[in-house]
């Protein structure tokens, strides 16, 4: 009897977790009105704000020059690019300084002299040097649309936002079985889930294509130099003091990135993020949120990586217990509820992959759908391993920054992109894809 009660309780908890996650993931597609509201409004041509674009780069000499060139093609007239390099990284420094020599009015190079380096320390090093009304953050491998700053400027002006979070999208879904799922995760997160968080007043910001009014950022003290998820931490702190955050996603305007080039790199990246979420949870800034539902959402979101690890281990164990041990028929049937939710999630992911390919002009073949389904259980094992590793590192007091290397896979010819020059923005997007082909 007790065993049956335990099995039913665990199964119902797993089922509720799966349903909540799926419902939030589908937020943007609930109604046509919600979907339309997630995009940028078309700018009117006025330039209201100036931008300081921070570009931290460490051992990124292979991709940094391309990113700077793309930023310099921006249609906005009032911005500066601040590249932050390490004092012990001469190769990346040389690339940054060459770019500054070519355009000294736009590009400046700041040197981070911290002995132990990480991204938030680099960003804080540059913050006192920012001259713009708004600080924007990009990563060294980012492929940024020339019209993005104009759209962000318009969003700040028309909404009165303190923060604007733009979209980020991994593109090289064809590179490996795990890159396919990684790309789809980003698609659901930035296309849908973050909009729900902004609507509810609690948002863990993304690591780049995030824009914050300079005075707001300085009032907040910049980034936490000891946090492995400095972006999430900043979003939690700003949400806790009631700052207005606007999220906008447009497939033409997204910043394009690549997935980690190896499975080990992905594991380390997820470990860092999970450990950072755990750090943010333990800091308890989220407890200052005014609403009870906001605090519940914050608690659940920050604990999600570890709930994933729990579910990845417990679901097969729970089914095995129900089938092999003496459990009532009713309890055995309940154990399959999480599996039903998983099947529904798979169907939604298949539809999402089709939409992803359609929006970005990428050819999604039948084999990609097979990889999506077959790779699901293995990807969950990877996420569970990263969560367990994050807990182990946090308990051991290890918080060194494990750098994710980039090779520019999103800049290579995928032979899967077609042009869609239906309007000015689509034409620019087609040119951006042609540049990636070259």
Roles of regions detected by a PLM:
Residues 100-104, 109-133, 146-228, 267, ...:
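Long helical/loop segments within the catalytic core of UDP-sugar-dependent glycosyltransferases
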Residues 22-78:
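N-terminal signal-anchor transmembrane helix
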Residues 34-43, 301-396:
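Membrane-embedded multi-pass helical conduit in multi-pass membrane proteins
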Residues 235-255:
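Catalytic donor-sugar/metal-binding loop of nucleotide-sugar-dependent glycosyltransferases
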């Amino acid at each position: 009897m007790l065993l049956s009660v335990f099995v039913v309780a665990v199964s119902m908890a797993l089922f509720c977790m799966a349903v909540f996650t799926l419902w939030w993931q589908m937020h943007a597609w609930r109604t046509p009105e919600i979907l339309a509201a997630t995009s940028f409004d078309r700018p009117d041509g006025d330039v209201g704000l100036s931008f300081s674009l921070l570009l931290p780069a460490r051992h990124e000499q292979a991709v940094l020059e391309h990113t700077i060139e793309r930023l310099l093609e921006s249609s906005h007239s009032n911005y500066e690019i601040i590249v932050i390099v390490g004092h012990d990284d001469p190769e990346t420094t040389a690339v940054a300084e060459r770019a500054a020599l070519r355009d000294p009015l736009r590009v400046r190079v700041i040197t981070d002299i911290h002995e132990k380096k990480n991204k938030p320390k680099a960003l804080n090093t540059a913050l006192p040097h920012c001259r713009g009304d708004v600080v924007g953050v990009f990563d060294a491998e980012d492929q940024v649309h020339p019209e993005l700053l104009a759209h962000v400027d318009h969003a700040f002006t028309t909404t009165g936002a303190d923060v604007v979070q733009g979209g980020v999208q991994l593109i090289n879904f064809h590179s490996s079985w795990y890159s396919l799922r990684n790309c789809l995760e980003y698609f659901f997160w930035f296309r849908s889930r973050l909009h729900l968080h902004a609507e509810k007043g609690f948002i863990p910001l993304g690591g780049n294509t995030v824009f914050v009014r300079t005075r707001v950022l300085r009032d907040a003290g910049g980034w936490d130099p000891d946090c492995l998820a400095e972006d999430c931490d900043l979003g939690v702190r700003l949400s806790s003091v009631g700052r207005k955050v606007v999220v906008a996603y447009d497939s033409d305007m997204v910043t394009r990135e690549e997935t980690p080039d190896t499975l080990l790199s992905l594991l380390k990246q997820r470990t860092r993020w999970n450990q950072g979420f755990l750090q943010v949870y333990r800091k308890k800034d989220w407890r200052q949120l005014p609403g009870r539902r906001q605090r519940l959402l914050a608690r659940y979101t920050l604990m999600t990586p570890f709930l994933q690890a729990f579910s990845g281990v417990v679901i097969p164990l729970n089914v095995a217990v129900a089938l092999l041990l003496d459990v009532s028929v009713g309890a055995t049937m309940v154990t399959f509820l999480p599996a039903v939710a998983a099947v529904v999630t798979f169907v939604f992911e298949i539809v999402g992959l089709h939409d992803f390919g359609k929006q970005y002009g990428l050819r999604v073949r039948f084999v990609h759908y097979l990889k999506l389904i077959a790779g699901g259980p293995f990807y969950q094992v990877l996420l569970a391993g990263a969560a367990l590793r994050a807990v182990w590192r946090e308990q051991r007091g290890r918080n060194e920054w494990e750098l994710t290397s980039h090779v520019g896979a999103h800049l290579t010819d995928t032979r899967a992109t077609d042009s869609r020059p239906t309007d000015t923005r689509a034409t620019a997007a087609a040119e951006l894809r042609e540049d990636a082909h070259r």
